[in-house]
């Protein structure tokens, strides 16, 4: 189930990149957020209640973080191979796991990840989009904030209701950006169909699979399995998008995967999905 979730998310990201020429990265974000929110709303509508006070503040903040992470990550995807972008973004959950640990040995994971990131940023001696690297790292920092805020939201608004409302808020936030880039092309049948696929693959399906997996697996095992995501992204990018990686980039991704697995196993807590 965890592997299925990972493959679903990365397939959704690969599908989203096919929309970039028509509606731009931000148009694709609008499709993902909008259809993802509608899918969640279908499951939570009957039990949904309006937030108030602290709940409302946590929901709005969570929605803003979701919007920022997706906008920056999809811009990074427009400039970098899928595997590279996802690997760089993974500094978020890795950082949260390490900062939450008080063990000095966890600095080893930081060092491993740092080497991997430097190798990726260097592009293996070839051309690399520096802005894409920066955007992916910003998205990773946002994912770290997402993890922290996810815990806060879960305490203030238990269940999927808070996430559903946050996704709706994120959709409202990204709408001006998506409409500015996508324009009338967002209303075409092919874009809407692909957007629905992105929303389901990137949000609804992985959430369902991960919730079921968390009921069956220890947190540490779940976290280690989730750390395979950069490798899965590289594989999907190679198969679906014909994105070849240099040997040094493969090694760099392997270093970040190893660092993430070690840090998440040590922390013993899973990294929530970033929207």
Where are these regions (language model features)?
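Specific transmembrane alpha-helical segments of multi-pass solute transporters/efflux pumps
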Residues: 8, 44-85, 117-119, 199-217
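Helix-helix packing/entry segments at the starts of transmembrane helices
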Residues: 86-88, 149-171, 203-239
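Membrane-interface interhelical linkers
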Residues: 1-4, 37-61, 102-108, 125-126, ...
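Transmembrane alpha-helices of multi-pass small-molecule transport proteins
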Residues: 21-68, 94-96, 142, 146-149, ...
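Glycine-/small-residue-enriched transmembrane alpha-helix faces in small-molecule transporters
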Residues: 1-27, 64, 68-72, 115, ...
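Juxtamembrane helix-entry segments on the extracytoplasmic side of multipass membrane proteins
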Residues: 22-26, 30, 51-56, 122-145, ...
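Hydrophobic transmembrane alpha-helices of multi-pass small-molecule transport proteins
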Residues: 91, 105-124, 236, 248-267
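Specific alpha-helical transmembrane segments that line the substrate/conduction pathway
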Residues: 27-30, 34-37, 66, 73-104, ...
């Amino acid at each position: 189930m965890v592997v299925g979730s990972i493959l679903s998310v990365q397939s959704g990201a690969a599908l989203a990149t096919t929309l970039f020429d028509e509606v731009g990265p931000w148009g694709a974000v609008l499709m993902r957020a909008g259809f993802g929110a509608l899918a969640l709303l279908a499951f939570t509508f009957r039990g949904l209640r309006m937030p108030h006070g602290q709940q409302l503040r946590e929901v709005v903040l969570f929605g803003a973080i979701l919007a920022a992470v997706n906008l920056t990550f999809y811009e990074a995807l427009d400039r970098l191979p899928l595997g590279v972008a996802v690997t760089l973004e993974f500094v978020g959950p890795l950082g949260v796991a390490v900062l939450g640990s008080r063990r000095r040995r966890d600095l080893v994971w930081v060092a491993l990840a740092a080497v991997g990131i430097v190798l990726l940023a260097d592009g293996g001696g070839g051309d690399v989009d520096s802005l894409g690297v920066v955007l992916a790292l910003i998205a990773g920092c946002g994912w770290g904030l997402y993890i922290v805020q996810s815990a806060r939201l879960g305490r203030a608004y238990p269940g999927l209701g808070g996430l559903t409302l946050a996704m709706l808020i994120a959709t409202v936030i990204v709408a001006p950006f998506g409409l500015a880039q996508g324009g009338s092309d967002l209303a075409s049948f092919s874009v809407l169909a692909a957007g629905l696929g992105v929303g389901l693959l990137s949000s609804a399906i992985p959430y369902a699979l991960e919730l079921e997996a968390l009921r069956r697996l220890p947190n540490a095992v779940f976290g280690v399995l989730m750390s395979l995501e950069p490798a899965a992204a590289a594989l999907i990018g190679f198969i679906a998008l014909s994105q070849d990686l240099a040997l040094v980039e493969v090694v760099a991704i392997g270093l970040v995967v190893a660092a993430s697995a070690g840090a998440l196993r040590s922390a013993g807590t899973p990294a929530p999905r970033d929207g």
